[in-house]
Amino acid sequence: MIRIGILGDIGSGKSYVAKNFGYPVFNADVEVGKIYNKDRKIFNKLKKVLPEYIYTFPINKNEISDAILANNSNLRKIISIVHLEIRTKMNIFLKKNINKKIVILDIPLLLENKINKKNDILVFVQSKKKDITKKLKKRKNFNIKLYKKFKNIQLSLGYKKKKSQFIIKNNFTNKSVNESIKIILKDIL
């Protein structure tokens, strides 16, 4: 099984690129949403470490945001609890797709949390800053302070780009992305 990890800036189109490969995708953001909506065990753990912020089940994203914005250490607490569960879900996904030729890992903190393996193929999604900003501002509940907190815990884009074997320039058109994906797949298969 070939594992392709998708890297890039927040809002660069990583999930869009991941879907367009046409292979099974593990999308960590989607899984986090499921955890917040359905996993009472994680809710109880978060409530225990952040009782003044987390009190609603299903977990309210505004409560998570308030906790992160209130204190830098709260983000680390949330990550330590949620990412363990994400790693477990990813391992289940990988076992389920063991016979697939390729799987795509759409995990924002792939390198930061050392989830990638040595022989993973890393694809960096590069987008213009102005396009990213325009896209982010359209997102429901976009919060610039929250965005900056997440940026601060990520490795630099330059480092991620250097670690990647391939770069996809995403100008947010199907054509450019799909042509790049075809070239990558031809090269690795």
Residue ranges and their predicted role:
Residues I4-I6:
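Hydrophobic anchor at the beta1->P-loop junction of P-loop NTPases
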Residues G33-N99:
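ATP-dependent small-molecule kinase phosphotransfer cores
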Residues K89-N97, I102-R139:
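ATP-dependent NMP and nucleoside kinases share a basic, alpha-helical "lid"
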Residues D9:
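P-loop (Walker A) phosphate-binding loop of NTP-binding proteins
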Residues S15:
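Walker A/P-loop
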Residues K89-M90, I98, K117-K118, K138-L189:
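Small-molecule kinase domains that catalyze NTP-dependent phosphoryl transfer to phosphate-bearing small molecules
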Residues S12:
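ATP-binding Walker
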